[in-house]
Amino acid sequence: MWLLLAVFLLTLAYLFWPKTKHSGAKYPRSLPSLPLVGSLPFLPRRGQQHKNFFKLQEKYGPIYSFRLGSKTTVMIGHHQLAREVLLKKGKEFSGRPKVATLDILSDNQKGIAFADHGAHWQLHRKLALNAFALFKDGNLKLEKIINQEANVLCDFLATQHGEAIDLSEPLSLAVTNIISFICFNFSFKNEDPALKAIQNVNDGILEVLSKEVLLDIFPVLKIFPSKAMEKMKGYVQTRNELLNEILEKCQENFSSDSITNLLHILIQAKVNADNNNAGPDQDSKLLSSRHMLATIGDIFGAGVETTTSVIKWIVAYLLHHPSLKKRIQDDIDQIIGFNRTPAISDRNRLVLLEATIREVLRIRPVAPTLIPHKAVIDSSIGDLTIDKGTDVVVNLWALHHSEKEWQHPDLFMPERFLDPTGTQLISPSLSYLPFGAGPRSCVGEMLARQELFLFMSRLLQRFNLEIPDDGKLPSLEGHASLVLQIKPFKVKIEVRQAWKEAQAEGSTP
């Protein structure tokens, strides 16, 4: 027994003792570190981690490192360094670390979001981008699909006139149906049990990821039971069962003559690979049903919660700034009126609305810290050495709240994205990366930007979004997981009188 214990302790020491660094190399300044636990005792435990990491820059500078268990993580808090990692050396830092909870979510690093650098990630990212390219023109045009769901959402909200409601469920339905159409070419009905199941799965996954899981830091603990791991396995199993049912139906009815969604593109790539009619990057093994499910799961997971959260943040800030909301509605009334729906082509005309969206993405970034990158080779950031296998995290919160880059960064000021005349959109700082950048940038950025503009312009054209009668304003603090979520709140829905009058005139014989 003592021999086994000695072997176990020696193994732990080998795994968690700081590794020898390259002689003469200059590394980022590091937090203190202890054997086994690393820097864990020296990291702030209270408050939101992205803010804590930002605070640590005061002592350690815009790039510093710390150890969690056996892993070294480098934290980036300046846009020049972030752009070097994401763009200039994007390929060198395009890896993803293995994390216990995310390995379960991604079926051992399959799919796109959490997949490590390699042929499978490159292939599935390319196929996903090909799928979005399907929706540029014609009946499958992305704008048309978004407008269809925006119509359904607005028609539902019209039935809630005078009521104070939580927008989460109707928004989630609308955005889920947009993603569903891109992936499968069909939409869910509000009462569909599969829709509710998908929403529950997404909520459950985010709940697990919002909590610190020791197994993510100390993989050796996998020999012990973990409630978080069991929950994640259950959510992923439920999600995969739902998606696999759709996949099987799609495979049965598949025709190469009609490629209209992401799943069709994945199946066609599999058919081509099986028939030796594909490029060298399309290995059939990388297009198994499990790989397809992981990619579809990524698109659903990233596409629904992110857009839904940002729209709720925008509404919340407008409730806090009613005069801004009124100015945006005045612009919509003058430029669009009530006889047509807003279009993407109006984005450069409704500049105050677009500036408001951009400011919300700055002050409350979707992901306050980007998903960790990993150095796939020995590299550097600035004049500092970064060893192969080092995790690198860009603190987007730090970039978006730097006093050196943004005047009064904690104040909500959409005008910072407008020129002095207030008529032209501008890019006021390079310290702004709401969707990341480079090889690991968000594949759905174009979709998200269109959704945010079209949904908000439609909502403000038809409705007054008001503070509930109890006078309770939404909290602007947020709750960080993979996504910075706003705390639940209600908004009073009122159909605008000008909209009613315009509709009455339009229906008059």
From Swiss-Prot:
InterPro entries associated with the record: Cyt_P450, Cyt_P450_CS, Cyt_P450_E_grp-I, Cyt_P450_sf
Entry keyword annotation includes Heme: yes
Activity regulation annotation text: Regulated predominantly by intracellular cAMP levels. The 17,20-lyase activity is stimulated by cytochrome b5, which acts as an allosteric effector increasing the Vmax of the lyase activity.
Pathway in which the depicted protein is active: Steroid hormone biosynthesis; Steroid biosynthesis; glucocorticoid biosynthesis
Binding site for heme: 442
Origin: domain of life: Eukaryota
Listed GO CC annotations: endoplasmic reticulum membrane
Binding site for substrate: 202
EC primary class: oxidoreductase
EC number annotated for this UniProt entry: 1.14.14.19, 1.14.14.32
GO terms classed as biological process: glucocorticoid biosynthetic process; hormone biosynthetic process; progesterone metabolic process; steroid metabolic process
One GO MF term: steroid 17-alpha-monooxygenase activity
Cofactor(s) this protein cannot do without: heme
Keywords (A to Z) from UniProt: Endoplasmic reticulum, Heme, Iron, Lipid metabolism, Lyase, Membrane, Metal-binding, Microsome, Monooxygenase, Oxidoreductase, Steroidogenesis
Annotated localization: Endoplasmic reticulum membrane; Microsome membrane
Reactions accelerated catalytically: a C21-steroid + reduced [NADPH--hemoprotein reductase] + O2 = a 17alpha-hydroxy-C21-steroid + oxidized [NADPH--hemoprotein reductase] + H2O + H(+); progesterone + reduced [NADPH--hemoprotein reductase] + O2 = 17alpha-hydroxyprogesterone + oxidized [NADPH--hemoprotein reductase] + H2O + H(+); pregnenolone + reduced [NADPH--hemoprotein reductase] + O2 = 17alpha-hydroxypregnenolone + oxidized [NADPH--hemoprotein reductase] + H2O + H(+); 17alpha-hydroxyprogesterone + reduced [NADPH--hemoprotein reductase] + O2 = androst-4-ene-3,17-dione + acetate + oxidized [NADPH--hemoprotein reductase] + H2O + 2 H(+)
PROSITE patterns the UniProt entry points to: CYTOCHROME_P450
Described function: A cytochrome P450 monooxygenase involved in corticoid and androgen biosynthesis. Catalyzes 17-alpha hydroxylation of C21 steroids, which is common for both pathways. A second oxidative step, required only for androgen synthesis, involves an acyl-carbon cleavage. The 17-alpha hydroxy intermediates, as part of adrenal glucocorticoids biosynthesis pathway, are precursors of cortisol.
Similarity-based family: Belongs to the cytochrome P450 family.
Protein name in the entry: Steroid 17-alpha-hydroxylase/17,20 lyase
Gene for this chain: CYP17A1
